[in-house]
Every structure is written in C-alpha cells, then in structure tokens.
Amino acid sequence: MKVLLYIAASCLMLLALNVSAENTQQEEEDYDYGTDTCPFPVLANKTNKAKFVGCHQKCNGGDQKLTDGTACYVVERKVWDRMTPMLWYSCPLGECKNGVCEDLRKKEECRKGNGEEK
C-alpha cells in the first residue's frame, strides 16, 4: 500500500510541475486516484522538483502517510489552501518520518502552481 501511495504521489508531483511549467489549468476530475488514495498537495521550487506539503492526510475516511525519508515542506494544509498561486514564499524543508514532516532547519523558495485547487 505504501509503495502504491508513493508511486501515485510521485506521479502527482510530476503532474503538478508540468501544470505549473505550462501555466495551464487541469480539472481534478480528469485524474483517477482510485478508491483509497487522494492527491497530496505539492509546492514547486526553483529546481523544478516539487515537494509534498506535509506527510499525512485524511482520505476517504482513512489516513494516508508518505514513506519515511520523502522530502516535504513543513507547511500545514490550511496554509497551503491560502497561498497565492505563483507567488514565491520561504518554505521550511523537511523529511517524512512516521507521517510527520520533520523540520530540517533549512528553507528554500517555493510556490503554489496556477492549477492548484483548495
């Protein structure tokens, strides 16, 4: 299950980069995440390697956790919801451990893509 989730999340990250790079909007209804997975929010950065927002989320009545060691931003989902698309922010870097994005005490510029929805 973790491998499937990681693969789905990685594909989403690549999709998010492509959407931001092409500055196009794609409706979420176009994607089939299956019955037990949901897309994790991501933020792009200047190296074009998007990272996940946090490491845990509720999905279809259950919990989803990213694999330990996965790069993430220490940003809450409600903060991501309020971010202005295409505006650069200073984002704290983290690494997933047991469903928590642990702060690495480093920051990099990141931004929410144009096609990202709440």
UniProtKB/Swiss-Prot annotation:
InterPro entries, alphabetized: EVA_Class_A
GO MF terms held by the record: C-C chemokine binding
A GO cellular component annotation in the UniProt record: extracellular region
Disulfide pattern: 38-59, 55-96, 72-101, 91-110
Primary residence: secreted
Record's keyword terms, sorted: Disulfide bond, Glycoprotein, Secreted, Signal
Signal peptide: 1-21
Glycosylated position list: 45
Pfam families: EVA_Class_A
Compartment annotation: Secreted
Functional description taken from the UniProt entry: Salivary chemokine-binding protein which binds to host chemokines CCL1, CCL3, CCL5 and CCL22.
Name used for this protein in its record: Evasin P546
Organism this protein belongs to: Amblyomma cajennense
